[in-house]
Amino acid sequence: MRNPSISITPEGLPAIGLCTLATLTFALIGCWVMAVIFLLLTWFCCHFFRDPERVTPTGAGLAVSPADGRVIRVEPVTDPITGEKRTCVCIFMNVFNVHVNRMPVAGTIRNIVYHPGKFFNAAWDKAATDNERCDYLIEDAEGGKWTMVQIAGLIARRIVCRVDEGDTLTRGERYGMIRFGSRVDLYLPDGYCPTVSVGEHVFAGQTIVARKSPEGA
């Protein structure tokens, strides 16, 4: 169950402020068509930049979704940082999803690599290698290595990273966002098995997407 408490992410305040100012300005001069248009834009920006609180599951040996959206792929893929073949859980965010990204596990950010690139549809396979993206290598308390990739999409034109290498964060903690539709890939370390399948809708910091297998415990 999602927590009803909702705030606005700081990245959205400039856009919301400008749209609100434009709405008031056009209303004061009697240009009601433009006032309504900017009122709708203000609502859209508030909706897009919403940042609801989430109840993150507790317990050992589990990972939560790093993003809101729909699972579009769960399959072995070459990890862009380690070069190893790992199970990847791919989550696609449309423009109506919450776009704040959260940590899948508690751990330390060991490496951050930004790649400038193109802006193909984030659901396409080639988006993982050709699009603008940001790779994160996370080390958990047991030494497990997790790779997380923010991928900009067709409309998304800015990846926001709020962390630095060496930062230690908790499971479900906010680490960044991507604006206006995008994708996040999570590469699982050995010993973890996915708990979601293609087509499922997940929520950042809340939906369990992987668990440690009995053999890996």
Swiss-Prot record:
Binds 1 pyruvoyl group covalently per subunit. Pathway: Phospholipid metabolism; phosphatidylethanolamine biosynthesis; phosphatidylethanolamine from CDP-diacylglycerol: step 2/2. Pfam families: PS_Dcarbxylase. The keyword Lipid biosynthesis applies. Keywords: Cell membrane, Decarboxylase, Lipid biosynthesis, Lipid metabolism, Lyase, Membrane, Phospholipid biosynthesis, Phospholipid metabolism, Pyruvate, Zymogen. Coiled coil: none annotated. It is a peripheral membrane protein. Is synthesized initially as an inactive proenzyme. Formation of the active enzyme involves a self-maturation process in which the active site pyruvoyl group is generated from an internal serine residue via an autocatalytic post-translational modification. Two non-identical subunits are generated from the proenzyme in this reaction, and the pyruvate is formed at the N-terminus of the alpha chain, which is derived from the carboxyl end of the proenzyme. Its main location: membrane. It is an enzyme of class 4 (lyase). The record marks 181-182 as: Cleavage (non-hydrolytic). The keyword DNA damage does not apply. Belongs to the phosphatidylserine decarboxylase family. PSD-A subfamily. Catalyzes the formation of phosphatidylethanolamine (PtdEtn) from phosphatidylserine (PtdSer). This is Phosphatidylserine decarboxylase proenzyme. It comes from Nitratidesulfovibrio vulgaris (strain ATCC 29579 / DSM 644 / CCUG 34227 / NCIMB 8303 / VKM B-1760 / Hildenborough) (Desulfovibrio vulgaris).
